[in-house]
């Protein structure tokens, strides 16, 4: 039997359900209101060591500042990142962006241009790979000396202690130098890219502590913990354009990129070039009296009204207010009455993931895999990963934090339509990896990947379930219809077997098969069914007739591939269980992450069991564990769901700051996936029954939860 026949809701039930959700999007058990502050406070981050890879962070979703144990970037050059900080190196002489036109590939007798690397045009291909890239706005740290004037080094730190107050979004740091205590408070303004810093120490009065500001040039590096080149002195400019008794402003120029840094201090201090330094891009704020230094530092692509900047204390107050509002909004979960010994670590991961995702991934653009910690893939975001970074916000009833970045779909719709037209197809083909404008990074996987294509239909459906209005329909109409039209045109009619197939060429979720031979990948088939089915529902809601072509493709789309009574990665795959049990086990995602269009639940359960036994858990990615957890929950195995969320693989670990493994470090899809799975397991899904249906009913789990939104 087909699962989806059990999940389709009649028109009357759909209206009743939507009426209920419009009044109160709540999934709440009988135990009542949760003490949210107690849940958050018991996972307060407390560290007493120097971490060289893992920063503590403050941020607002668009901007983040990573710090070492001193509360600034004193000994470890962590990064200051934003969603607007993009840079491109100059093009090679004689090379134009228009030189790249794609690479034609035979697709069922048609030569279709795909956005893959062009070996005949290596210069422009290489330039497009690396540009644009995100850059580090600058480094801020303490410049400290001993009584004899020699510089303080990391090994001189004594009794370091740092606490991240998650409830307020403020970092409190302290340590000793030569027996004297130094205290640093660090906070981020919730509404602008500005930091508030407060420093207190007898060393301030002794003239032995200042704050340095060091600006790097953009670098060619990728997958590096430190972003920027601090030695390329002659390739950029740092110009002090104002310098008063209590403020200063710096204009930064890197090739065609400009931005501003502004400082405002509330305690006596002077600002200028750090003269002992060889770098013209290093400056020093030096207190001139008292034991305190309090300042604000702001970054912007536009000139800053320095006199209107908030003080450090005002930023502290605003941060505390905004973070309390965040924690009190949306859903919450409390596992503290459970007796399973894993409850505390699971709850810690849940709380810290909510913090680091709000800091790094609640901005005006979809996030890159490493958020605003460092650069991976040159800082660009991946369209197929938007689901894993953001769906949790909708399920945790914080839709607005996801919605603020989804404008990329209508914004990039015209260029995506052009991309499809160049390929001889209708509709819109979404890119795979891009920055703040729609230009694909030419790469084999990027040009041939397709599982990002139905995403906007899924997001639109989430939005409509939360906001079933004409306004929502109008908002998503063109995106949904053009996404589906491309999907229908992409499917190839196999006349010999009277069916539609996907690929070749196609790069699938796991990216580990031969794209020129792969046909009918299971996850993509399931998602195509979901996307076309849902798009037809949208046509009906819009008062439009069903599109006959879409129904034809739906009705004749190839079934999910089966070998030896279990699902397999793609149709006809050879040696599936001896050669391909690594990378993403996407065959488990068709019923869990997705609602199960075309799935036989008996076959699925056998498949999930086999994957659990035979897949190489140290050769997959962080979001694969939540994907399997959702599959386990939806198929009636909540014990396995918990096992997946607490798996001991090196690919799914969460450090002291909540930063996760699972890919190039840190890997935020691990955090987003965890929150998505937990929301589903607590709040349920279409067709689920009972309270917290994804948690075990073995007497070891007591799950208090409220305000979750059921998953599709």
Stretch-by-stretch model annotation:
Residues 366-380, 430-448, 503-521, 651-663:
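Acidic/His metal-coordination segments adjacent to aromatic residues that form catalytic metal sites
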Residues 129-153, 537, 672-708:
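Catalytic cores of secreted or luminal carbohydrate-active enzymes
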